[in-house]
Amino acid sequence: MTLLKNDTFLRALLKQPVEYTPIWMMRQAGRYLPEYKATRTKAGSFLDLCKNTGLATEVTIQPLERFDLDAAILFSDILTVPDAMGLGLYFAEGEGPKFKRALQHESDIAKLHVPDMEKLQYVFDAVTSIRKALDGRVPLIGFSGSPFTLACYMVEGGGSKEFRTIKTMMYSRPDLLYKILDTNAQAVTAYLNAQIDAGAQAVQIFDTWGGVLSDAAFKEFSLKYIRQIVAGLKRESEGRRVPVIVFAKGGGLWLESMAQIGADALGLDWTCNIGEARRRVGNQVALQGNFDPSALFGTPESIRTEVARILTGYGHGSGHVFNLGHGINQHADPEHAKILVDTVHELSRQYHGG
């Protein structure tokens, strides 16, 4: 494999010395970019875009052509895994993802099994293709949804505001939910390991909906299964460590518990105080975040002020990857995203080195 020209992102995740704070943005390849919209139109649909190796590579690289980002992230969707389990993923216009065959009957759950990874070969082909296109420019991040977040979509049949169906199952038939979560954990472990084999140099587990759970339920139905995945991941590839990032939106309450599951870094949403988060986790993990995506709707001056506040909050030394606290908004101005990236690089140097 080609030598990595910029490994700042990987070094920061492992708390090794860096010259500046690296940055990438969740959903950096997305609808806020006109070039993404053009490629998406060419593909025909979102799923066709995910499954077309050439076009998935193209949209992954697009933000790097515009911004001086320190990592690329595979263009895909967290719901590829349940789709490979036969649940029939589709996207209704304006409604987001849906499943034709949601898991609402015991008989369906009994039949659920870890999918053959060959059904996800298009994802691994994209990883290999993107690595080739990057040519060592920056590292490539692979990713998956967490077992609980995937289960939310699988049981609800799509997105939800109150998660009544899955919470009813959780409190009345936890045995059924355990079966789904265990299957998901095995599937995600195999899926991320296959991404690493294909060339992913770091991986992130997105627990988008973990924050809707009670304290006890988060530990029992989400964190336990993320720990299971982390324990089963390949941590070395191409002669170097493959860092694992765990991002639980709304998970700021559980940082101490999350810091103990073996991940290299924790993602923070924008509601957390990053300085307090650093004190709470100590030296156990690096931190990633946590600029409010809505702050990109501010002025260039307000964006710079917010960047400075977060960098000051984290303080001196390595172990911080700058990111948004959630995905970039589709209405964000790409020029403001550029100001964000350049400001992080400019202002962070004072916190590193001599």
Curated annotation (Swiss-Prot):
It catalyses: uroporphyrinogen III + 4 H(+) = coproporphyrinogen III + 4 CO2. Pathway: Porphyrin-containing compound metabolism; protoporphyrin-IX biosynthesis; coproporphyrinogen-III from 5-aminolevulinate: step 4/4. GO terms for biological process: protoporphyrinogen IX biosynthetic process from glutamate. GO terms for molecular function: uroporphyrinogen decarboxylase activity. It is found in: Cytoplasm. GO terms for cellular component: cytosol. Its EC number is 4.1.1.37. Signal peptide: none annotated. CDD domains: URO-D (cd00717). The keyword Lyase applies. It is an enzyme of class 4 (lyase). Coiled coil: none annotated. Pfam families: URO-D. Disulfide bonds: none annotated. Keywords: Cytoplasm, Decarboxylase, Lyase, Porphyrin biosynthesis. Catalyzes the decarboxylation of four acetate groups of uroporphyrinogen-III to yield coproporphyrinogen-III. Belongs to the uroporphyrinogen decarboxylase family. HAMAP family: URO_D. Homodimer. This is Uroporphyrinogen decarboxylase. The lineage of its organism: Bacteria, Pseudomonadati, Pseudomonadota, Betaproteobacteria, Neisseriales.
